[in-house]
């Protein structure tokens, strides 16, 4: 196995890291940033943007720019009604009642969108390592259910990655934090990202990272903070002007970006100003938004959201069997933990200062890289014992959920229980697999259903049906049912309710590869266009400076080649075939090379003539001084002509330097 990269696939930003020697390292992307916005945009001309370039154009293209897609991963349409209201793009009902994104006439699954981000991270790692990357560890929120985990695996597969392991974000953070610490300690990891919240209690010691308990909320994160700010600003503006900016997608996108910036600024400053000129227009003319916002107002807006995390911390401690005083370290993970109110709430709860030695944006990817190192054999003496976040069981008589594997059970694990029939002469049983913490089956999430047929007729309660739940290290479930009398067995690998068959995943994978190839071709074409522009400029400058040194026939050929290239440049596009431009560039290069030889010959002749004239002047004049001053009898500045020739030799070499203008490389 080669290098196994670690990926934090985040709601707002994503990060990729890899083990370098004994330490995990975050890899910078092509834009020079250590984090990549989890944003994908589709332009009218078919071009696809990802990361910072996609985020930059969101204001002018909000309906076709997808962000926060992680909130829709592995989710039914009816589960994400609140999230749908918060995004500018269209979310529709797809197959199997899943949520999908409508872009033009195409419905994209969240897995496909996430795969585009993963492709970007994969390419980032390959550029850094100088080799193909196929294996990865990807992190998910600890409270992700089975469907969300499977959807994340599918996204990796579509992106061309072999997902070696899915691990929980708080657990990954603890790996990065505690890799070099051999002391026994209890650690609380508080992870508040862009769209999800988790808190985990772990015991660390002697290379063993054991998760005792985890709780969370997959509907809570920095996006919710932004939404409160957006509504506050929009309400204030509507009160002043009577205009609701939330009805205008472009204005709403500007508002969203301003709210995000204000949130970040208020993490370090007491006040900030939101200034959005020309935010909208009325019959009276353009309207501008200018508003001062202080930290106290912001904290009042989000206080109840932050308080929602407190009961989760209490539950995690209780399930772990620890008290607050047992906790040795509190680690903050996720960009939203930079908000002072969040830090104060966590520190007040645990009664100690949080450990801020790790970068909250990067620590999860670093931990994923460590786990990748464990799997590849680059890291020794590390054992990760994670837990399943929710109860797992089946529906039994009366619509009750009977739990086989309880929440916060260490994985991998396997549990069996014997059930029987509910009616006389029942020859088939349905196994309805559930995940959740509610008592009744209807209140929990269905993971799958299957039937065990061929049970011999018998009075109810007589057949012995053994149901086995088996969870692997990724937290993904296999369920089997066996009739103990006949030995007949039926099993199911619980699949995500993504509506994706193996064939569909393979098709999406091929499309993703084609997109990657097209993106590379587009970049190559853009580079060629830039080179052609630079070449045309250099030749124009050369003709202006040295045109009199080029014979008429070659000067005419050069001018024709230059005109032909400029004509091609007028219509050249990185999105289309540019074979004609490449041919014109090659012809201009050849013509310029031939002209260059004529220029060099002319300059050499001039240099020789200058040197000869200078020598004649020295013989005819009255000494060296006379030669220098150039009196009657010798041309002025003979030696200077010689120096001029030397200068001309240097100037003859025209450096065709050009700046690569690639929107994808601009931060």
From Swiss-Prot:
Stretches the record annotates as Disordered: 495-525, 595-667
PTM-bearing positions, type Phosphothreonine: 196
GO molecular function: ATP binding; ATP-dependent protein folding chaperone; unfolded protein binding
UniProt keyword list: ATP-binding, Chaperone, Nucleotide-binding, Phosphoprotein, Stress response
UniProt cross-references to InterPro entries, sorted A to Z: ATPase_NBD (IPR043129), Chaperone_DnaK (IPR012725), Heat_shock_70_CS (IPR018181), HSP70_C_sf (IPR029048), HSP70_peptide-bd_sf (IPR029047), Hsp_70_fam (IPR013126)
Biased composition (Gly residues): 630-641
Induction remarks: By stress conditions e.g. heat shock.
Biased composition (Basic and acidic residues): 506-525
Skewed-composition ranges (Low complexity): 595-612
Acidic residues bias spans: 647-667
Family listed: Belongs to the heat shock protein 70 family.
Role: Acts as a chaperone.
Name recorded for this polypeptide: Chaperone protein DnaK
Organism of derivation: Salinibacter ruber (strain DSM 13855 / M31)
Gene from which the chain derives: dnaK
């Amino acid at each position: 196995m080669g290098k196994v990269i670690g990926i934090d696939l985040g709601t707002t930003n994503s990060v990729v890291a890899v083990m370098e020697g004994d330490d995990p390292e975050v890899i910078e992307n092509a834009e020079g940033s250590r984090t990549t916005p989890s944003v994908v945009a589709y332009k009218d001309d078919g071009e696809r943007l990802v990361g910072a370039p996609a985020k930059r154009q969101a204001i002018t293209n909000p309906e076709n720019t997808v962000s926060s897609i992680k909130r829709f991963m592995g989710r039914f349409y009816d589960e994400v009604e609140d999230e749908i209201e918060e995004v500018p793009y269209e979310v529709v009902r797809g197959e199997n009642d899943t949520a999908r994104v409508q872009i033009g006439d195409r419905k994209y699954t969240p897995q496909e969108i996430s795969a585009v981000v993963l492709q970007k991270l994969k390419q980032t790692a390959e550029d850094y390592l100088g080799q193909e990357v196929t294996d990865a560890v990807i992190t998910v929120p600890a409270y992700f259910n089975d469907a969300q985990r499977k959807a994340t695996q599918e996204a990796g597969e579509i992106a061309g990655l072999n997902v070696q392991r899915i691990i929980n974000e708080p657990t990954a953070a603890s790996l990065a934090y505690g890799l070099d610490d051999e002391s026994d300690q209890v650690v609380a990891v508080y992870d508040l990202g862009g769209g999800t919240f988790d808190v985990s209690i772990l015991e660390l010691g002697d290379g063993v990272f054991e998760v005792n308990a985890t709780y969370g909320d997959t509907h809570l994160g920095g996006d919710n903070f932004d939404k409160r700010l957006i509504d506050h600003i929009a309400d204030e503006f509507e009160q002043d002007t009577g205009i609701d900016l939330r009805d205008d997608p472009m204005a709403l996108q500007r508002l969203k970006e301003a709210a995000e910036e204000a949130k970040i600024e208020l993490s370090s400053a007491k006040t900030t100003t939101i200034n959005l000129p020309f935010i909208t227009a009325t019959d009276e003319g353009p309207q501008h938004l200018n508003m001062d916002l202080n930290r106290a107002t912001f904290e009042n807006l989000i206080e109840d959201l932050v308080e929602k995390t407190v009961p989760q911390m209490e539950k995690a401690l209780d399930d772990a069997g620890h008290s607050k005083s047992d906790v040795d370290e509190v680690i903050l993970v996720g960009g939203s933990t930079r908000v002072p109110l969040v830090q104060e709430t966590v520190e007040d709860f645990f009664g100690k200062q949080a450990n801020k030695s790790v970068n909250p944006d990067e620590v999860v990817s670093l931990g994923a890289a460590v786990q990748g190192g464990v799997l590849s054999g680059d890291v020794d003496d590390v054992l990760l014992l994670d837990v399943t976040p929710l109860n797992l069981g089946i529906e039994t008589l009366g619509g009750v959920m009977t739990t086989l594997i309880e929440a916060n059970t260490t994985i991998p694990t396997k549990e069996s229980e014997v059930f029987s029939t509910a009616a006389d002469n029942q020859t088939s049983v349905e196994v309805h697999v559930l995940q959740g913490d509610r008592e009744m089956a209807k209140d929990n999430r269905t993971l799958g259903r299957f039937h065990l047929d061929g049970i011999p007729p018998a009075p109810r309660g007589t057949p012995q049906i053994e149901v086995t739940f088996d969870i692997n290290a990724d937290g993904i479930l296999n369920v089997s049912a066996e009739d103990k009398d006949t030995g007949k067995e039926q099993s199911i690998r619980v699949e995500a309710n993504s509506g994706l068959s193996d064939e569909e995943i393979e098709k999406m994978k091929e499309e993703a590869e084609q997109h990657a190839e097209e993106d590379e071709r587009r970049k190559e074409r853009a580079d060629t266009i830039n080179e052609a522009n630079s070449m045309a400029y250099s030749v124009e400058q050369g003709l202006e400076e040295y045109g009199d040194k080029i014979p008429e026939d070659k000067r005419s050929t050069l001018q024709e080649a230059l005109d032909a290239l400029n004509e091609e440049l007028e219509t050249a596009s990185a999105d289309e075939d540019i074979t004609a431009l490449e041919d014109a560039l090659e012809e201009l290069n050849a013509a310029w090379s031939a002209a260059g030889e004529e220029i060099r010959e002319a300059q050499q002749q001039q240099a020789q003539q200058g040197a000869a004239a200078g020598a004649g002047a020295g013989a005819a004049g009255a000494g060296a001084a006379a030669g220098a001053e150039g009196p009657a009898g010798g041309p002025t500045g003979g030696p200077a002509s010689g120096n001029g020739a030397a200068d001309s030799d240097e100037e003859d070499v025209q450096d065709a330097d050009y700046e690569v203008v690639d929107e994808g490389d601009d931060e």
